[in-house]
């Protein structure tokens, strides 16, 4: 450190030390006076004796109470600040966090589901962001909030953990000081002479510090103890003893001597490594499913004493017995959940260091003693399995210990999910990445890899797009494997052998939509530069598409075929109409599918589209209903956005948000689902965090192992569960319309539509995101995020209605 640097550091340190640490415990005779006696809060609030985290707290009535903090040149934060406090909202409270400067020097307020934070620098830069909670914060519980300003930006913390951040492009300098007192707990907003934004509940331990504090171990310790207390325990030792007692009660006194306890956990609960599990121990693992359906649970093995437990084996049964004692085959699979690094969270989500993602098969499992490490347990009920209740056990063995037999029960409804995917879908396999795992010239190896990915998608009720990205693969792959449509000497030439073979195989497996034909986004018509339409015209597309229609008819899948020639052309109406017009002339029986990108589809200025695919938050709802009434399906999709709390496939989207992608699409009246990539950026030797570095892994819910073979994820399994939910709903509506309509009403009540004026016009590009201005309210999903069992109960009703 140079002498000048030392002087500068000393000046900053001295300035920080000179500013007071303003702290309020709200104890003593003058509760509104800071603990050092130098600063007084003004306003109204009631002292709640003995109700604080320690000692007393302040209670706000949610109607008129609020406080103000007057800052001046002596006490105001400058280059660094930590604003922190504990609050305990009361039932019905909608405002928290609870601090806001009327001039927006500092803003830190929101609701139980989402909060907003911002700070202005002295030179006028606005640093801001928002943060969505995986589940809404509960009233009646203490929550600790902190907002930290330093020379890199602004960060927020909830209960001691990082939750949000807004980075500055350069050193922030001083925090803006407008001279207007900050509001605390009320009158957070004023408009037209009326005040709003009043907190109802308790406030304790309010601090404004002149330093940036980015670690809160004392808060995490308090929260952990609160969770123990809420579960009825005073210590970790008490929790472990209760687990031993529960194991003995379930399995006999010898089970208390095993080095672990066992618990079953819903697949819709996201378990993070440092979570504290206080749930039920030793209960039988139960599933409910139709024949030809997969269902999932998590199996949690909990070592005692913080001791690592290597080499644990889990043996799953091959059969279960029915009520007559007959052995009936079931397919169980157990996998280790790998916690992946997440370099950057999706917008508004907590920056979690590790997230549960890949599912790794293995014969033995090494369990850490200091972190949760759940296993994933899947059961597949074979087609033809009669309805009834089937029982058996799985065996868990730790080295040097006797096996534990954990009861398993599967209730099978007396109906079967169809082999064919009745919910139309299309999902792209990113073939560009597969080619990196095979040597040049190994066409068979490439096709084998592609087949594994397509098969995995089909097994999870998703239709793969087959051999669509010819322009993204090496010339030798394109020539050997792809149709590579072209016109030579006036005739169409295409290598259809591999495509036809794979499509025939997949249709036997349940493929219900076949995307066929050139995909102009990924060939030289666009990638080569120049005018896109001129380049397409040069390929003689009428001849190519006429050939394709004839070929699909000859192969027997014209009824399932769709043309998907362009992707996300947005408001390029003239270009779109040229493409659709060409296609209608050349292949009038081949329906054209069109994705929207950042435009509000459907739109009446666009002609010749047979299947509209607006992105979830770029939908014109009035036009959608008109198109559907005219017999034209309207699917939906997601692509990097929308962001949580809207459903999506980001790595950090909580499981219920992924399942609600399918359920929500069904609820809001879409007819199908498309997704742009299942395995994006999984090329050979990609950095370990490469898939998750783009859009928080939203296009990567199938990974690749070292040989390129597909590796499933929690997200794939959860999305598949949602697709099965959607399938069951469609089956019920077809078989029993009255029962289906009743379920629809319950689903609409569970996930309400935003209130909007249906007469308000939604233009193609304005408002920019039509769904957000009309029917789609991300926070409407919070009830089911808070209590996933609400959806599981409704799913049970669907199953029972079909069962009867």
Where does each model-flagged region fall?
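Aromatic-lined carbohydrate-binding surfaces of glycoside hydrolases
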Residues: 302, 351, 355-365, 371, ...
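Short, solvent-exposed loop/turn segments enriched in Ser/Thr/Gly
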Residues: 281, 292-298, 373, 386-393
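Extracellular glycan-associated modules
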Residues: 19-231
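Catalytic domains of carbohydrate-active enzymes that cleave complex glycans
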Residues: 504, 509, 517-533, 537, ...
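Short, surface-exposed loop/turn segments at beta-strand-coil junctions that are enriched for proline
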Residues: 74-76, 380-387
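Surface-exposed binding patches on compact interaction domains or structured appendages
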Residues: 238-281, 298, 304-377
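Long, low-complexity ectodomains and other extracytoplasmic segments of secretory-pathway proteins
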Residues: 225-285, 294, 305, 401-442
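Catalytic-core region of carbohydrate-active enzymes that cleave or remodel glycosidic bonds
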Residues: 610-691
């Amino acid at each position: 450190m140079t002498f000048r640097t030392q002087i500068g550091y000393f000046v900053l340190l001295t300035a920080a030390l000179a500013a007071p640490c303003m702290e309020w415990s709200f104890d003593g005779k003058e509760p509104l006076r800071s603990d050092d006696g130098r600063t007084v809060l003004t306003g109204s609030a009631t002292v709640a004796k003995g109700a604080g985290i320690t000692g007393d707290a302040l209670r706000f009535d949610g109607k008129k109470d609020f406080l103000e903090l007057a800052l001046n040149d002596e006490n105001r934060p400058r280059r660094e600040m930590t604003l922190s406090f504990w609050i305990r909202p009361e039932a019905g409270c909608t405002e928290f966090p609870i601090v806001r400067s009327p001039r927006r020097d500092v803003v830190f307020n929101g609701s139980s589901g989402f909060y907003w934070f911002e700070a202005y620098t002295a030179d006028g830069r606005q640093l801001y962001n928002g943060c969505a909670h995986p589940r809404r914060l509960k009233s009646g519980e203490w929550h600790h909030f902190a907002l930290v300003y330093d020379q890199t930006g602004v960060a927020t913390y909830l209960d001691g953990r990082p939750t949000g951040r807004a980075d500055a492009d350069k050193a922030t300098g001083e925090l803006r000081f407008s001279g207007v007192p900050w509001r605390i707990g009320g009158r957070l907003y004023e408009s037209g002479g009326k005040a709003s934004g009043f907190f109802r509940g308790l406030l304790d331990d309010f601090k404004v510090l002149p330093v940036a504090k980015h670690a809160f171990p004392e808060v995490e310790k308090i929260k952990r103890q609160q969770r123990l207390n809420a579960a009825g325990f005073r210590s970790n030792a008490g929790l472990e003893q209760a687990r031993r007692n529960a194991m003995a009660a379930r399995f006999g006194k010898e089970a208390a001597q095993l080095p672990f306890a066992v618990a079953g956990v819903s697949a819709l609960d996201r378990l993070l490594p440092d979570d504290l599990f206080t749930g039920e121990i030793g209960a039988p693992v139960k599933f409910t499913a139709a024949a030809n359906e997969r269902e999932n649970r998590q199996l949690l093995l909990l070592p005692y004493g913080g001791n690592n437990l290597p080499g644990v084996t889990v043996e799953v049964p091959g059969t279960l017995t029915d009520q007559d004692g007959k052995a009936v085959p079931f397919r169980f699979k157990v996998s280790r959940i790998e916690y992946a690094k997440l370099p950057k969270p999706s917008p508004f989500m907590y920056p979690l260091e590790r997230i549960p993602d890949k599912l790794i098969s293995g014969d033995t499992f090494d369990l850490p003693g200091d972190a949760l490490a759940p296993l994933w347990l899947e059961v597949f009920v074979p087609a033809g399995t009669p309805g009834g209740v089937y029982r058996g056990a799985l065996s868990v063995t730790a080295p040097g210990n006797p096996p534990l037999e954990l009861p398993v029960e599967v209730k099978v409804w007396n109906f079967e999910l169809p082999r064919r995917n009745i919910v139309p879908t299309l999902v792209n396999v990113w073939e560009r990445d597969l080619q990196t795992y095979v040597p040049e010239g190994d066409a068979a190896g490439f096709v084998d890899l592609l087949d594994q990915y397509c098969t995995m998608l089909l097994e999870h009720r998703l239709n793969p797009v087959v051999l669509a990205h010819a322009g993204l693969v090496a010339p030798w792959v394109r020539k050997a494997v792809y149709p590579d449509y072209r016109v030579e000497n006036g005739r169409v030439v295409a290598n259809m052998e591999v495509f036809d073979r794979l499509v025939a195989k997949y249709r036997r497996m349940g493929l219900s939509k076949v995307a066929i034909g050139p995909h102009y986004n990924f060939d030289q018509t666009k990638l080569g530069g120049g005018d896109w339409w001129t380049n397409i015209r040069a390929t003689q597309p009428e001849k190519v598409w006429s050939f394709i229609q004839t070929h699909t008819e000859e192969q027997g899948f014209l009824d399932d075929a769709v043309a998907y020639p362009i992707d996300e052309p947005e408001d390029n109406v003239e270009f779109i109409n040229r493409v659709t017009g060409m296609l209608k002339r050349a292949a009038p029986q081949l329906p054209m599918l069109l994705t929207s990108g950042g435009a509000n589809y459907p739109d009446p200025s666009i002609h010749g589209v047979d299947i509209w695919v607006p992105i979830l938050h770029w939908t014109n709802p009035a036009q959608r209903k008109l198109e559907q009434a005219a017999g034209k399906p309207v699917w939906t999709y997601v692509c990097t956005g929308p962001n949580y709390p809207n459903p999506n496939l980001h790595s950090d989207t909580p499981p219920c948000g992924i399942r609600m992608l399918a359920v929500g699409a069904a609820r809001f009246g879409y007819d199908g689902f498309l997704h742009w990539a299942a395995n994006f950026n999984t090329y050979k030797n990609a950095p370990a965090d490469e898939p998750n570095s783009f859009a928080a892994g939203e296009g990567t819910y199938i990974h690749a192992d070292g040989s390129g073979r597909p590796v499933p994820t929690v997200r794939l399994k959860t999305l598949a569960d949602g697709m099965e939910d959607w399938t069951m709903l469609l089956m019920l509506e077809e078989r029993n319309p009255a029962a289906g309509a009743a379920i629809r009403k319950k689903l609409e009540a569970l996930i309400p539509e935003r209130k909007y004026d249906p007469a308000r016009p939604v233009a193609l590009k304005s408002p920019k995101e039509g769904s957000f201005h009309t029917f789609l309210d991300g926070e409407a999903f919070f009830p089911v995020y808070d209590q996933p069992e609400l959806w599981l109960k409704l799913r049970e009703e669907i199953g029972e209605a079909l069962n009867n």
